[in-house]
From Swiss-Prot:
Its EC number is 2.3.1.181. Belongs to the LipB family. Residues 43-231 form the BPL/LPL catalytic domain. The lineage of its organism: Bacteria, Pseudomonadati, Rhodothermota, Rhodothermia, Rhodothermales. Substrate binds at R88, G89, G90, D91, V92, T93, F94, H95, A161, M162, G163, G174, F175, A176. The active site is at C192. Keywords: Acyltransferase, Cytoplasm, Transferase. GO terms for biological process: protein modification process. Its main location: cytoplasm. The record marks K158 as: Lowers pKa of active site Cys. This is Octanoyltransferase. It comes from Salinibacter ruber (strain DSM 13855 / M31). It comes from the Bacteria.
Amino acid sequence: MSSSAQNEIVACHLGRVSYERARALQERVQERLIAAKRAEPPEPEPHVLLLLEHPPVYTLGKSGDAANLLVSEERLEEVGATFHRIGRGGDVTFHGPGQLVGYPLFDLDRFFTDLGRYLRTLEEAIIRTCADYGVTGTRVDGRTGVWVGPDDRGPERKICAMGVRCSRWVTMHGFALNVTTDLDYFDHIVPCGIDDRGVTSLAAETDAPGTVDDVCGPVTEHFGALFDAEVTTRHGDDARSFLRGLTGERVEAPGR
């Protein structure tokens, strides 16, 4: 067993990727991690953290209520968005430009086999990232994700949504941190099925939110620290080449 692969996370900073392509990538990496742990002897692959942006898309989790999508799918097409029903936990949410989406493909057998602890660790990575930008992120009892407030700006509001799926302790799906997101897109849904709280972004909470690319750095650093793992970061074409070699899936560069 390779000790380097045992505790290595490859963070792939990909830029903008379609939801369909990112989902296919997740499935292929998850399949590869599961196959590696079934091998005799096990041959652990590195864990993978996909960091990217999506074009406008709404997703509904397997336990979600379609009534929380407040407009028709035809109306979403009119505003340039798509809609997908998917297998993660959680309700309806939005992904789009200005939002950092993170998909950890981790074999929790090599960290800890506790899904609640895993979610709290994801939250902690985002709380620490928010703090890097002068924003105090918090948890809310009974609700997954990272929140801001209540404070003089208003009541509790969600800055980062989370929803995960796990198969044989290998994770997929993950988190969506609003950086400079156009929050008007959330007017078309009841975000995460919670109708008594709003949403926010780093840009709404601070004068210096950075860009999505900027925020990838601290997120990657905090993942390495919290999972006690060695992190290798790959950007752009290097990340796409790595993933194509790993999965056979082609990842188009933004704008191509």
